[in-house]
Amino acid sequence: MAASMAHYQGHLSNRITTGRAETVGQAQYPPRRAERKYKLEVEQQPIRARMCGFGDKDRRPITPPPCIRLVVLDEMDRELDFNEIDSTYFVLMVDLWNESGQSAVNLVRHSSAAPTVSISSSTTTSYPPPPERSHYVATTIPGYDAHSQAYRHQQHQHQHQHQHMQPQPMAAAGYGPGAHTGVAVPPYYPPTPQPPTPTYQQYPAPAPAAPYGQAPAPSAMIPATPMSSNHTRNLIGMNAVNACRLNDTKNKPGFWFVLQDLSVRTEGTFRLKLFLFDIGAGDGTNATVAADGPTRGKGKCLAVNFSDPFTVYSAKKFPGVIESTPLSKCFAQQGIKIPIRKDGPKLPNQAEYDADD
């Protein structure tokens, strides 16, 4: 009994002096997130692309498609086996940066001269508001009831255009052929009670008429048009991708991020900035994710890296897409949607046809 007690005390003293008083056998479990290191290795760098312009459906993918391998290291800087990693909630985010990697160039000013017209502004332009007519008559004919005339104008707005050209009853009564030589005052019309608003009146109601002798306010004559932003995204396509479990050209399995659907609107030299996020909740293995899926809060950025500079050409200067690489063909055979150039004799402008595929 005494011998076994001494053996236990010696074993306990050894664990305390070596600093390993935690759970025995912890090394057999995956290390915690704080003890892991994550790296993004760009195994296939982007080289060139043709600018896609500002069309909504025009896409000119970057060639070759960037392929990024996820590397996870333990506390001893040893690469972990992919079987020990759950990449379910690992997400790669991509931004577009300048050649020097000093500033982001995700937004670009739209170069089109035609402004984008919203629905409200186009409706106002297609159907001129009644205040223009009422203000014009109110400032030229004294004693005229602008409110009643504006209502009559709205009431007959759906009739034929030749009915609008007929003289109004007031003009026929008070302004005959020789009326312009005198200072005759038109007869007084009693105010007409306002009926309920017609159901077809879906446009802004007429503004109140300005008093006689005063010019109407500019805001009453010309409806304000909201200013729309003329900036748009410079990098378009899938800029957030999940990790895929793929085998490389040496048949080595691993986790890869393939960016086969990225296009740039403008020409120039750029870099891709890559961010690795873990949107799961747990110890880095994503084994204790909540039942409702990924976290609703903030996701931790685990790694950041840049690609090599690549050039985006205009349509006239574009030398053609890059030949399909062995890595692209390898991933395409495993189900990744990468456009692969067909082998065989090349026809004139074959590069353009392949780029449109």
Swiss-Prot record:
Presence of keyword Nucleus: yes
Cellular location(s): Nucleus; Cytoplasm
Domain Velvet: 32-341
Signal peptide: none
Any single Gene Ontology cellular-component annotation: nucleus
Record's function text: Component of the velvet transcription factor complex that controls sexual/asexual developmental ratio in response to light, promoting sexual development in the darkness while stimulating asexual sporulation under illumination. The velvet complex acts as a global regulator for secondary metabolite gene expression. Component of the VEL2-VOS1 heterodimeric complex that plays a dual role in activating genes associated with spore maturation and repressing certain development-associated genes.
Name the record gives this protein: Velvet complex subunit 2
